[in-house]
């Protein structure tokens, strides 16, 4: 006759906290928030609907209900705050948290949300019921709330030394146990009463003393859920077994879990001793029992698939016996699946790291093979054209330092060709008169600056002797040397003014530092064929672009019976009839015939 009034929020709350959801559906949650804000009694009806959902036995429904309540508290203002801080809702939370059948994760979430709501309602003293309920739950269940994360402090040298000492002690204890394990069977057979003592001694190393470093611990078990708040931290849930790798900070270790590596706080885990021999034997026996039931499982499956549906299974003793025998291995099978699933994840992660390392190594190896280091072989740098070369201590042009002849390839002298930079084309210098005497004296006192550098070593030639150079009013026609000794100039260019001295200075046997300025009139002529000594006059100083004086002797006067060779004689001694004598303007009159100087 009298039925409870239907709550308008039951369907909306049930939809937002459905047990079949895989995660929070924020579309449904926001629909509930909008409906609460739109109706006058929306806050009261929504909290009543959530209390019903908290009584559900499904842990997912309980977790979704807590998330819905938190969303309402953040979006619906003081009306929903008052209903959440009511006695009915807080009692429902305490009742669920104190129930032993409630999932541990649900209990932790209740404590977390009550803590958030206490801080949210702290400004209004009328909502103090939530704070009282939170303190009561925290006192009754101290293990629900995870501890605060320790501060990351660098490990000091003393901590490192202590860790090393503990490692050495653990190694010594392990060696002692292995040495004592040898005569154990003989002692057990001769004195059975000593067995309890041996078992006590074997169980003693399982106790982990306080302050143990990561060097002596290989595994830890998580006591609380840990959510990383900074990069590099390891996420885990309560009950996970973490493999310890090393100590990073004073209260933080580095570990590996399900293929992930990161640091974790020590107050969130408990230390686990290494498995003993008995534990390893127990695990091996469990695996043997599981694999021993494979035939029975296959036989049971065959019997059930071949029998007709009308068969009474209860009357068939064989099927019943096989079913009960295989049913006992299911918990062991689930445990082994979890164990080897974790190992598979670890091995898969290790394989991925190895593949990445191998690819990086191969790429670096290919890069180093495709771009080998090039030897730094090059000739010494030459000064650029147009700039004077560095001079020595006595004012002479100083050439580049002589490199090691074994490090560079040098062509044979007869195959070398002298290349000169382009210069401006100069007119035929015949008919020009030398400039005044002071200019010539100044040019003689100061050697011309080097304005170019030949590219190769100049072969030995009689034209290199500066004593063969002369100047006259009439310049004889130029006779070119053989092709293998010809000095090549670019088209439309002539030799720079200082070419003859520069060619002389390029000889390997000649070094400007071997003689002083007093020896300028007689430079060393070693390794040159002896030539007749002739008077030498200074070079004329002309405008830029004038052709340099010839560096060879002119041919004899035409009209002879036989045509003489255009090349100078290499025979030492008296000059021949066709040799050339320099013309001296100071000793000849203006009307003198230049031809009289040919002998």
Swiss-Prot record:
Where is the organism placed in the taxonomic lineage, from the top?
A: Eukaryota, Fungi, Dikarya, Ascomycota, Pezizomycotina
Matches recorded under InterPro entries: ENTH_VHS, GAT_dom, SH3-like_dom_sf, SH3_domain, STAM, VHS_dom
Query: What does the subunit section of this Swiss-Prot or TrEMBL entry state?
Result: Component of the ESCRT-0 complex composed of HSE1 and VPS27.
Instruction: Report a single Gene Ontology molecular function.
Output: ubiquitin binding
Compartments where located: Endosome membrane
Q: Which PROSITE patterns match?
A: SH3 (PS50002), VHS (PS50179)
What membrane topology does the annotation report for this chain?
Peripheral membrane protein
Q: What's the protein name?
A: Class E vacuolar protein-sorting machinery protein hse1
GO BP annotations of the record are: protein transport to vacuole involved in ubiquitin-dependent protein catabolic process via the multivesicular body sorting pathway
Q: Where is the composition biased (Polar residues)?
A: 413-427, 462-474, 509-525
Record's keyword terms, sorted: Endosome, Membrane, Protein transport, SH3 domain, Transport
Gene3D superfamilies reported for this sequence: 1.20.5.1940, 1.25.40.90, SH3 Domains
